[in-house]
């Protein structure tokens, strides 16, 4: 087995605060990233991989534009088991977690508040690949994805605040999917890639809308012809669905983006590409 650990930290706020300008003396800016990867050989056919990542940005600009602060952060962890069934079949089983958040702090007198938003993702995946020959490769798998987001909440930041706390309702979505794909090379210069992913999306309800379940099919196909070593001619079709929607306000000069899963009102968006 082997392992890898790395990280970095930056404090540019120290340099900014030393510039001598009164409006910059209380400035805080900190950035960090941490990575760790470990893999271990269990047997000739089995190997385990584990990786984690954590990163964050912290900024405070006191007195500048009356004072504000912003924080971003992201953390992920992945555990993957690779198993070789035989010389033609191998499988991967993965468990994945991710968490993203951001916070905005207003430091104005009388309007000191903290805005928070976060979203979490939990995934289980099983992928199987079968290569019966040098010209044929078959892939299949399943996935279970639980998505949870708290679009936003606002609360008092300190004692000198007139803000009325408010918290938006947490939204959840369950995505269960199966997929299959075939890659076939024939007549030496032709290759066909075709597959389909089918899924059911179960969205939780609220006081504004009912819980709802969507059935989605996402087929794709590509036929390519290799003209020579540097040229290829291909024709393709692809259909994909977007199950998360970002709501943003371009007129507000702060990170106001909110991610929402689909529901009975905000339906999935389908894209078809030729």
Residue ranges, per PLM feature:
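Outer-membrane beta-barrel "beta-signal"
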Residues: 83, 222-224
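Predominantly transmembrane beta-strands of Gram-negative outer membrane beta-barrel pores used
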Residues: 1-41, 49-53
């Amino acid at each position: 087995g082997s392992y890898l650990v790395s990280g970095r930290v930056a404090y540019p706020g120290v340099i900014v605060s030393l510039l001598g300008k009164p409006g910059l003396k209380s400035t805080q800016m900190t950035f960090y990233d941490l990575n760790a990867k470990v893999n271990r050989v269990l047997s000739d056919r089995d190997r385990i991989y584990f990786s984690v990542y954590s990163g964050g940005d912290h900024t405070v600009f006191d007195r500048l534009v009356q004072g504000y602060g912003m924080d971003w952060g992201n953390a992920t962890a992945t555990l993957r088991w690779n198993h070789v069934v035989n010389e033609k079949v191998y499988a991967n089983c993965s468990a994945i977690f991710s968490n993203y958040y951001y916070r905005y702090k207003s430091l104005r007198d009388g309007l000191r508040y903290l805005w928070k938003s976060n979203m979490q993702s939990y995934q289980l995946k099983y992928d199987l690949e079968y290569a019966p020959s040098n010209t044929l490769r078959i892939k299949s798998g399943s996935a279970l994805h639980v998505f949870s987001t708290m679009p936003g909440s606002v609360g008092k930041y300190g004692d000198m605040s007139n803000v009325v706390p408010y918290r938006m309702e947490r939204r959840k979505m369950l995505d269960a999917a199966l997929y299959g794909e075939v890659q076939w090379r024939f007549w030496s210069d032709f290759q066909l890639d075709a597959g389909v992913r089918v899924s059911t999306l179960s969205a939780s309800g609220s006081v504004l809308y009912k819980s709802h379940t969507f059935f989605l099919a996402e087929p794709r196909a590509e036929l390519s012809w290799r003209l020579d070593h540097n040229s290829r001619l291909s024709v393709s079709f692809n259909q994909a669905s977007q199950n998360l929607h970002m709501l943003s306000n371009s007129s507000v000069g702060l990170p106001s983006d909110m991610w929402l899963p689909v529901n009975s009102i905000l339906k999935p968006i389908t894209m078809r590409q030729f």
